[in-house]
Amino acid sequence: MEIVELKDDNQEYFLDALLGKEIEKTDFSITEKENFKQNKFKELRNVFSRDNILKFGLMTGEVQIPIEQTDGSVFLATINKEQITKRISKIEEKQRRLIRYVHISTLQVLIKSTFLKGLDTPLELTLRDNRLLNLEESKIAVGHGNLKYGKMKFDVNLQLGLSLKDLDLDRSIILNYKFLRRNFMKEGNHAFSISYRINYALSNSHHSVEFKQKEKIYIDELFSEVLELKHPVFSKLTKSQSLRIEPSPVFEKPLISFKENQKTEEKTVFKPPKRDFELTETSKLKSMISDLTQKVVNLDKKI
């Protein structure tokens, strides 16, 4: 086997290799999951594997929020690119030059008021992916709370891998906050503080977290989780079958009613009256008409 080109730096990873004659003579296929595990293909598997560099860290911060910045127009950036750069500088040079991604696991946010508890002060929080153009689609999480209880806290499990080359990395995952009560505090004062904590990891691959228990990223395992396209569902149906929709009665199933201390009882939605009920009522009406007729006859005789 001969390596034609290998590029591995903080920009990209690329490997091109010519297969040896012993492999060319086999029925090797990259789509067969078991192929790479066979002894005769172990060399190929090792060549196309690469080191998995994964450095975990924790960032935390606390900021004071002036009352004039609580109208929703100001946001808090949760990723500090300068801090990430400092963290990368602590990694040994051989691995440092390969770092390409920052993975965000969990974001925790704690908001604490600077005023007494009990004051009605609703607050709206929106966590956004600010890289997206559509405002609605950029929403990761939306929360509503009230600082009359003194504190608000929420956790968001992000599981995002971001490229360190992103122009907006510092402004990518942001927290918008909006005080819903106006004319609450004089300008120049601070209504609350925001403390945040982020679990993160720096890596050389977008897939590093998936291999966090392993020192290598193996090509066969990397592609084993990719969605496999199956034949269309309608492939076994005739054209008429696939296009036909069978109507079903609206009230096809009985309703189930639960009564306290009683067994489950089934009742249909529309239950037609019994035939004997109809006969009984009809006979009663006939009897009443007959009685009235007789009374009229008796009155005529008296007159």
UniProtKB/Swiss-Prot annotation:
Signal peptide from the UniProt entry: none
Entry keyword Transport: yes
Superkingdom of the organism of origin: Viruses
Compartments in which it is found: Host cell junction, Host plasmodesma
Alphabetically ordered keywords of this record: Coiled coil, Host cell junction, Transport, Viral movement protein
Primary location: host cell
Coiled coil: 272-302
Cellular component GO terms held in the UniProt record: host cell plasmodesma
An annotated GO BP: transport of virus in host, cell to cell
Stored Pfam families: MP (PF01107)
Record note on quaternary structure: Homotrimer, through the coiled-coil domain. Interacts with VAP.
Function: Transports viral genome to neighboring plant cells directly through plasmosdesmata, without any budding. The movement protein allows efficient cell to cell propagation, by bypassing the host cell wall barrier. Acts by forming tubules structures that increase the size exclusion limit (SEL) of plasmodesmata, thereby allowing viral ribonucleocapsids to spread directly to neighboring cells.
PANTHER family associated with the record: CELL-TO-CELL MOVEMENT PROTEIN
Protein family membership: Belongs to the caulimoviridae movement protein family.
Protein name per Swiss-Prot or TrEMBL: Movement protein
Organism from which the protein derives: Soybean chlorotic mottle virus
